């Protein structure tokens, strides 16, 4: 059975570029990961989390949704689980604004022209994340159209 997403995760899912691989970083329970995989719109879906517990929960969610075989789960810190150019969209949902920008700062390739679309759904401090994006990325990046904050 496919999980139901709340309005913010539904909005995030709708912003993922179809036809390209996608990564759900900080996938936690795996609901968004499962919905993305079950949609059939993406050639590859990666779910990643920092801790084994949430990754195990994501695996259960994927199994119940019948799409475990369409997802690669990775254990690791932020974007260290990805290589530049590996995915077309990265979703960072459910972590704080500060954690979101710390993750982005550790992987400068995400804000380069031709980099992936970055869909951010911070759990807290939305306005601070938007301000940080404006100050640190939007002024210096021609890729601003692919930096989306829900």
Task: Describe these PLM feature segments.
Residues 44-49:
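Conserved SAM-binding motif I beta-strand of class I
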Residues 29-41:
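Conserved SAM-binding loop of SAM-dependent methyltransferases across substrates and taxa
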Residues 20-26:
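Conserved class I S-adenosyl-L-methionine
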Residues 114-122:
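Conserved beta-strand signature within the Rossmann-like core of class I S-adenosyl-L-methionine
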Residues 55-56:
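Short alpha-helix immediately C-terminal to the canonical SAM-binding loop
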Residues 1-18, 34, 59-84:
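S-adenosyl-L-methionine
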Residues 139-144:
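Conserved small/polar residues in nucleotide/adenosyl-binding loops
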């Amino acid at each position: 059975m496919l999980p139901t997403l709340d309005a913010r995760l539904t909005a995030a899912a709708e912003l993922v570029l179809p036809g390209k691989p996608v990564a759900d970083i900080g996938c936690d329970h795996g609901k968004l990961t499962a919905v993305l995989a079950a949609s059939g719109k993406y050639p590859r879906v990666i779910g990643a989390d920092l801790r084994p517990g949430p990754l195990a929960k994501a695996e259960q969610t994927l199994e119940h949704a019948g799409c475990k075989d369409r997802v690669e789960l990775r254990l690791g810190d932020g974007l260290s689980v990805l290589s530049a150019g590996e995915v077309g969209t990265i979703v960072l949902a459910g972590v704080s604004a500060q954690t979101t920008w710390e993750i982005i700062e550790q992987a400068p390739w995400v804000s380069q022209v031709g980099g992936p679309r970055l869909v951010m759904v911070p759990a807290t401090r939305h306005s601070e994340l938007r301000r940080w994006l404006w100050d640190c990325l939007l002024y210096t990046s021609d890729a601003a159209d692919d930096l989306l904050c829900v």
